[in-house]
């Protein structure tokens, strides 16, 4: 992560995030849909869950509101919107929108972002439900092992390895973005804007690379 951010800057991070985003999307969409098919579709999955849990638990799990009503439901909805506002305000995400080529591309970018989020987060929820049906409620002591184990059960080893890399891709895409934003904050916001407004672009690039390397090394040791 430090190497390609150091060498390529924003362009390298953008291209690697593009590839990583596709890996995550394929993992979160293909894996739960294949598992759902193995379980016999939606009806087969719900029947399996009902057999493994009490009727009340199964009803709550498959209920879009989770059994919440009234103020509890409203608080959950408002909390979800609150998370959405916070998500859109994260610096490493705003940097992506600030780099859009033109105002006309914002609409296209918005559609892509919303479509990706709906598919990815919807797939993540579905993956949890189908994993519960496939493995049972008490199979894992650590729920984070669910996705790798499900991938190994559903696909050949080589393809399962690619899907398991989806988790690594998620970590890398966040880490390189945070690294890039921190670097730009120090080199541009602090040094260029406050310390040396007359700094040349070549000097700023050198400083950015040095800061990237320092932050990466510190992060590794921490």
Regions from the PLM with identified roles:
Residues 159-192:
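Membrane-helix boundary/coupling elements in multi-pass transport proteins
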């Amino acid at each position: 992560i430090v190497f390609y951010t150091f060498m390529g800057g924003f362009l390298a991070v953008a291209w690697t995030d593009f590839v990583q985003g596709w890996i995550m999307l394929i993992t979160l969409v293909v894996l739960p849909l294949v598992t759902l098919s193995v379980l016999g579709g939606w009806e087969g999955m719900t029947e399996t869950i009902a057999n493994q849990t009490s009727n009340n638990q199964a009803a709550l799990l498959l209920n879009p509101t989770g059994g919440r009503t009234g103020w509890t439901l409203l608080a959950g909805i408002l909390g979800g919107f609150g998370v959405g506002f916070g998500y859109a305000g994260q610096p490493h995400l705003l940097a992506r929108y600030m780099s859009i080529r033109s105002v006309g591309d914002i609409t296209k970018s918005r559609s892509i972002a919303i479509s990706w989020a709906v598919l990815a987060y919807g797939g993540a929820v579905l993956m949890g439900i189908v994993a519960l049906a496939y493995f049972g409620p008490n199979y894992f002591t650590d729920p984070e092992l669910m996705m790798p184990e499900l991938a190994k059960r559903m696909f050949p080893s080589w393809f399962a390895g690619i899907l398991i890399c989806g988790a690594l891709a998620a970590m890398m895409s966040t880490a390189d973005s945070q690294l890039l934003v921190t670097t730009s904050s120090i080199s541009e916001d602090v040094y260029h804007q406050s310390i040396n407004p007359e700094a040349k672009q070549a000097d700023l690039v050198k400083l950015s690379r040095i800061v990237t390397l320092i932050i990466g090394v510190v992060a590794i040791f921490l």
